C-alpha cells in the first residue's frame, strides 16, 4: 500500500461483506463508532452483558475490545466475549486505551494479550506500554510519536502474532516482519473524540475479511486518513469536521 | 392518517404538552434520543439506578424501556421503573432490540410483556420473535420486511393489548383491530445509529397524550418519516443527515 | 468581567494550559462534553472504575462529578475519585443534576458536599435544592429562573467555600461575597442535550487554572454564552446548532 493511496479494492470488499462488528467499547465513543462503521457499510452492534456478549461474539464477524471505560463487570463480560469469539473462530481486536497510565486496565490487557488477538490498535504510548517498553503517557493522550513506537509495535507483533497498528500523525501497521506506512489525515482528527477508537472498530471489522490481514488493516487505516483529509477541507471547526468526516467515509469511492 | 401526511394536530399537541419522557435506553443512542425528543419539544430524562428509576417513572409522563445494551442491574432497574409507572398510571413502551437473536434479553422481554406495555416498537425480526413466530435476525438488523411481520404485530397487539408498531421502509401501527400505514422517510435513516431507538422514545412520549393512542403512535412514526424525507435532501451523507434530521424535526410545521 | 464580554486572557490561559479533565459524568452527555473540552483546547478523559478513578483523579488537573445517571457503583467510584483528587490537591466540581427531585442522588450530593468542592454548577432548581431552600423541579428541567436562586447560590457558596454558578438565561457566579453576571447565549442551548453538563466540565477545568477562581469560572460561563450567541446565527435548528456550537468554541478568538 502506498502512502496517501486509498485501497478501493479493500473498500469495495469491506462494503460488500458488511461485517457484523461486535463492539465492546467505551461509553464516550459508542455513537461515533457505530456511525463510522455504518458509513463504511459495516453493521455495528454493542452487546455487553456477559452471557449475551459470549453468545453474540460467536454470531458476529468480528469483536472489538476497547478498555477506555473499563469496569469490573465489563472486564468479565469482555473475557466471555473473547472466549465466544475464539470458540467460533472469529477474530478479535484490542484497543488498549490509556494502558500504561492506569494500573487496573494495564493488568487486564496484559492478561487478555495471551488470548491471541488478531490485531492491536493503539497510539505510541499505549503500544510502548503494552510491549513493556514504557510507563505510558498521561491518560488518553500520547506523548510519543508513532515512529518512536515502531520497534515496540514490531516486538509486540512478534510476541503476540497479532497485526499491530500504532497510529498518529503517520500510521504504521506491522505483522512483525512487514510494515506498511499510512500517511494523510489531519490534526483535526485529534480534536474530535473517538476517531482513534472508531479506527479500532474499523480495524476489527477488517480482520474478518478474507485476504492478507496486514493489507486489510492498513487499508482500514487508509480509509480514515483519507476521510480526514477530505473532511478538513469541508469544515470550519471540529463540530462540522465530525459530520464531514462521516460524510467523507460514506463518499470515499466518489472522492477517490 | 394518510400516507406521507404529517399530522399537524398531533404535532401541535405533542409540542404543547412537552411530555417528560423517562428513557431507559441503550448506551449507543442516548444523546441522539434526547436530541430527537428535544427537537420535538418533549423533555427527555435518563434515570437508571433502581430506586430512582422507580421514583422518577411515577413523576414522568411516559417511560421507555429499550433493551439494546441490557445488563442484569439495568434489567432490575427497568422492572422497578415499570412498577413505578404502572402504580402511577403512566404508560410504558417497549423497544425489544435484537430480541430473538439473543437469549438473555429475549427471556427478559417475554417476562415484562405481561406488565401491560402501552406500546411496542420494533423492526420486523423483533416483532416476529416477540410474537413467537421467528427465531430472529442477526442482532440489530432485520432480515424481514415490516409487511411480512404485520400478522405477527396484529397477533401481538391482541395478546398484549398494546399498540404495536412494526417499522421499516413502511411502518405499520396496529391495535389488533385497526392498522395504520405510514410511508415516507429514506433509507439513509438506516445508516445513522439510533433512528429506530429514538422513534421508540417518541412513541413512548406520544402514549402520554390524550386522544386515540393508535393515532398518536402513528403520528409519531409520521414525524420521523417526514423529517427523514426532508433531511435527505439537505445532506451529503449520514453525518450531515443526522444534523439535518434533528433540524427537520425542529422545523416540521414550517416544512409541512 | 463585563456582561457579553469574552475574557480572551482567560481563554488563552485555558488553551495553553490544556487542563487534563477527569469527567465522571452521565451517560447521555459524554461525547458532547468531550468534544466541548477538546474544542476549547482541554484534554478530557473519562475513567470510571473505582480503583482507576482514584488513581486518575490524582494525575488529572481537575475532576468533574456529574450525577445525571448516578448508580450505586458509580457513586462509590466517585467518592474514591474525590478522595484521590483531594489527596493530590486537585480541585473537583459538582454538577448536581436533578438534585431535589430524586432522593438517592440528593442524599449522595449532600454527603459529598462536605468534601470541599472547588465549584458547583447547576440550574436554579438544583442550586435551591442543594442549599436546602426548595424541593426541586421535575427532573432535569428547572422551574425557576437563575436570579431567583441567587440568594441560595450565595448561601451555598458561604456554607461550602465553593464557587457557585447558577446558570440559565443569565448566569450568576458567586463566591459568597462577590457575584459576577454573564449574559448572552441563546435559548437554543436548552434544546441540545448536554450544554449545561458540558459547561460544568469547562468550569471544572477552569478551576485548575492559576489566578482568581471566581474570574476563571465566570470566564468559563462566558465561553459557552459567546459560542451559543455565534452558533445560533449559523444554524437552522438544534442539529446544526450543536455542530456550530463546537465550531464556535474552536474559533472563539477569531470571532471576538
UniProtKB/Swiss-Prot annotation, chains A, B, C:
InterPro entries: Hyethyz_kinase, Ribokinase-like. Substrate binds at residues 46, 194. Keywords: ATP-binding, Kinase, Magnesium, Metal-binding, Nucleotide-binding, Thiamine biosynthesis, Transferase. It is an enzyme of class 2 (transferase). Catalyzes the phosphorylation of the hydroxyl group of 4-methyl-5-beta-hydroxyethylthiazole (THZ). Its cofactor is Mg(2+). It holds the Pfam family HK. Gene3D superfamilies: 3.40.1190.20. Its EC number is 2.7.1.50. It comes from the Bacteria. Pathway: Cofactor biosynthesis; thiamine diphosphate biosynthesis; 4-methyl-5-(2-phosphoethyl)-thiazole from 5-(2-hydroxyethyl)-4-methylthiazole: step 1/1. One of its GO terms (biological process) is thiamine diphosphate biosynthetic process. GO terms for molecular function: ATP binding; hydroxyethylthiazole kinase activity; magnesium ion binding. It catalyses: 5-(2-hydroxyethyl)-4-methylthiazole + ATP = 4-methyl-5-(2-phosphooxyethyl)-thiazole + ADP + H(+). This is Hydroxyethylthiazole kinase. Belongs to the Thz kinase family. ATP binds at residues 121, 167. Signal peptide: none annotated.
